[in-house]
Amino acid sequence: GVLADQWKEFFYCDSMPPDVLMMKGQKRTGGRSSNTGGEDNIISNGSVIAVNNGQCMMIVDQGKIVEFSAEPGAFTYDASTEPSIFCGDFKEGVQRSFESFAKRFAFGGQNPKNQRVYYFNTKDIIGNKYGTATPVPFRVLDERAGIDMDIGLRSFGEYSYHICDPVLFYTNVCGNVEDEYRRQELDSQLKTELLTALQPAFAKIGAMGIRYSEVPAHTMELADALNEVLSKKWREKRGIEIVSFGVSSITANP
């Protein structure tokens, strides 16, 4: 009942496995607490929410974001205040996203029916394999030798990414999941878009005068080029971006 839900609770999230991108927080009541009737999706005013390193926390109220914290420590929920944000190491874009999507509801004395604490994995998501099924065009340009031609490249390797804007990630990707959201649900789409972006990214590398055989030594430039190509789909819509792009092998087809 409503009275049972007014007891303070403690929300936390254990260390998230590397394949989990978002997880619903776990509720713990004190050993002396009689809040046995508290509902899982109700957050009592004054509840404490723990945030560990490599995580950020978000409170949603009937699907709308009301609190956000990326700073490790203990966060105390105060339902009477305006929505708050503690960005931690995140860029100011998270602040703008929060201001766009956050909202405080007034319930006229009635408790909300669906509040949740979500935790996001802010560590680098590594080991994402990619491979070109067909050759990707690459421009070979050498003005001194008078060479200007296209060749096909096959490339294989791994890349890593991270969630750079959890507000966008929640709003446009995972939403109100019941328990957790795993990378496998997103992998296929990301891989397809990454391979599509390789062609314009290779074009940027080629325009810099980098030979195809030198590409493995210029993976930072390639990662920057991919982020530039993918910025609208990944960073500005989903709140994720490439951290590193590794090339384990690259071969040319004339």
What is each PLM-predicted segment?
Residues 1-254:
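N-terminal hydrophobic membrane-entry segments
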